[in-house]
Amino acid sequence: MASSFNEETAKKLLTQVEFYFSDSNLPTDGFLNREVTKSKDGLVSLPLVCSFSRMRNLLGLGNINREDIPPRIVEEVANLLRTSDFLKVSNNGQRIGRGTKLSKPEEVLEQVHRRTLAASPFEYSIKMEDVSSFFSQYAKVNSVRLPPNIADKRRFCGTALVEFSSEQDTQDILRQSLVYAGADLVLIPKSDFDCQRENMIKQLGKSESHNEFRRGQIVKFALKWIASEEKVTNKEKPSALKNKIKEKEDKETGIADREKENGDNSCASLCKDNTDQLVVPPWNNSNSVSSEVLKDLFQRFGSVEHIEYSGGLDSGYVWFTDSETAMKARAAVEFVGGLVVKNNFSVALEAINGEMERELWKRLSSAELEGGKEGHKKEKGKDECFENVQPTKKARKEP
């Protein structure tokens, strides 16, 4: 029976099916590997293989179910696959598989990794066929993979993984200086790529965890100016404050429950009224408080993520690394009736609730990631995408 496939389509179909059952793919293809393993003769349904997305595209079948694939198409594909020295087709043309049994998957994967290199940069719209065609000029290519960006799985990361037919070919290519579309290609072993990518995934995980919104971490603080001629009655030495905080820890849970029920309590409800204090806006005093001083103050209770405060204002926000620390700070400040800063200011804390808390979190997150204004600065360069990571070897442009 004459095939209806043209030469180009026939070549692509044969290459695709050989890839499905190859050492490069089968050990890591969970679905197909299970189908092969549970089959006594190692063969699987050819209509099933024809229903794979790339096969459907090559066959022009659209979104058809395997049960609805015309028998004529399956027969033509079977006849085409019989020309392969690598594949085995059943007598009835309904089943397909490898001609030889797959070796131990662990050993096969190790060999594949040694035959593979990572090449970059490639444009994000590039096709696997283009990469394969380019490297086929230098050695036989077994397979090409285009890994997704770790931060956006819908996009190509810019680095192609190219497997050659032998480890020696791979080593020879790594020593060459190649140029693609006017760009010097960076060539590194796959093992280096895997290490760099793993580090990027870890950093991204830390970043996502860090940027996850959690209630109760952000607290508003208010400053009251204490007249110099008045006696400060609530000044606490650091050691005394720590002792009072410790004494208060057993009562924190109850305080937190009351605060949740009365989340809109004013600052005055958290800081005792004191007749010794005269409320005067801090900006009228030359000894205004800096964000660094406030950060040192709040770090008595635990780690502080960010401080939003401009000198001269009478309020700001402190972002603790966890809600437990924020609760401890609020409970302790309420217990001692307000903290005293530089002998001139009393600091009271107030809960933030509802949508306002989420909006503040978005704003403080952006400021913290940008390095902040007067708050603590985050080390930059940790969350860059893999394609920006400096490789271990850089290819130079050909003369």
UniProtKB/Swiss-Prot annotation:
Claim: RNA-binding is one of the keywords in the record: yes
Subcellular location(s) of the protein: Nucleus, Nucleoplasm; Nucleus, Nucleolus
Composition bias type Basic and acidic residues, residue spans: 370-385
Gene Ontology biological process terms in this record: tRNA 3'-end processing
Domain spans labelled xRRM: 269-399
Known tissue expression: Expressed ubiquitously (at protein level).
Lineage top rank: taxon: Eukaryota
Keywords: Nucleus, RNA-binding
HTH La-type RNA-binding domain span: 3-106
Main location: nucleus
Function: Binds to the 3' poly(U) terminus of nascent RNA polymerase III transcripts, protecting them from exonuclease digestion and facilitating their folding and maturation.
Name of the protein this chain belongs to: La protein 2
Organism: Arabidopsis thaliana
